[in-house]
């Protein structure tokens, strides 16, 4: 009889995805309930603020003015990517911890933004990084941060694998 690890692969890492999803949704609810649209609360003067913004597009508001169809396009993409990530996680070996964490972070972030997109028609953003109140990076959220960290980890794993034939955690 196969053990749980061989049957389910690294699906235990879905707990990390769930944690990302919960932190993302709780933080979005907090800022949506405590800020007015585009209001800024300065955390670190000239560098970092909390805000409230809705994004109907993708990263950097890509296709935000699409008229509504983009909501469903990005939702379908998120569902497909999430399914691929779950299958990938399931197939990982016992020693693929670095890769499992990366995939779980991306999955949790994708699900957090997918929920917003389907339930609300937009993604809630609340983190604002800027330089001297003049040069602003687009607002983002916890899910976006998890996706970014996971993607960087995936890239590092690929570069390490390509260079040495081993994964980062080998």
Curated annotation (Swiss-Prot):
Any one GO molecular-function label of the UniProt entry: aspartic-type endopeptidase activity
Subcellular location: Cell inner membrane
Natural source organism: Pseudomonas fluorescens
Transmembrane stretches, start-end: 11-31, 41-61, 69-89, 95-115, 136-156
A Pfam match: Peptidase_A8
Active site (catalytic residues): 125, 144
Record family assignment: Belongs to the peptidase A8 family.
Known role: This protein specifically catalyzes the removal of signal peptides from prolipoproteins.
Matching InterPro entries: Peptidase_A8
Pathway: Protein modification; lipoprotein biosynthesis (signal peptide cleavage)
Protein's name according to its UniProt entry: Lipoprotein signal peptidase
EC top class, as a word: hydrolase
EC number: 3.4.23.36
Signal peptide: none
Membrane topology: Multi-pass membrane protein
Reactions catalysed: Release of signal peptides from bacterial membrane prolipoproteins. Hydrolyzes -Xaa-Yaa-Zaa-|-(S,diacylglyceryl)Cys-, in which Xaa is hydrophobic (preferably Leu), and Yaa (Ala or Ser) and Zaa (Gly or Ala) have small, neutral side chains
Keyword list, A-Z: Aspartyl protease, Cell inner membrane, Cell membrane, Hydrolase, Membrane, Protease, Transmembrane, Transmembrane helix
Superkingdom of origin: Bacteria
NCBIfam families membership: lspA (TIGR00077)
GO cellular component, one term: plasma membrane
Gene Ontology annotations of biological process type: proteolysis
């Amino acid at each position: 009889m196969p053990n749980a690890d061989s049957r389910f692969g690294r699906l235990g890492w879905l707990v990390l995805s769930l944690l990302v999803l919960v932190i993302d949704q709780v933080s979005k609810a907090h800022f949506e309930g405590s800020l007015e649209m585009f209001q800024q609360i300065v955390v670190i003067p000239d560098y970092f603020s909390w805000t409230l913004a809705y994004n109907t597009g993708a990263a950097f508001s890509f296709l935000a003015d699409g008229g509504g169809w983009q909501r469903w396009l990005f939702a379908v993409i998120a569902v497909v990517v999430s399914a691929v990530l779950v299958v990938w996680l399931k197939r990982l070996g016992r020693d693929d911890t670095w890769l499992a964490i990366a995939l779980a972070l991306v999955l949790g972030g994708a699900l957090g933004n997918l929920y917003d997109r389907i339930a609300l028609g937009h993604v809630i953003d609340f983190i604002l990084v800027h330089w001297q109140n003049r040069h602003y990076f687009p607002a983002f959220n916890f899910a976006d941060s998890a996706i970014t960290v996971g993607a960087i980890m995936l890239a590092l794993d690929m570069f390490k694998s390509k260079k040495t034939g081993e994964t980062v955690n080998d």
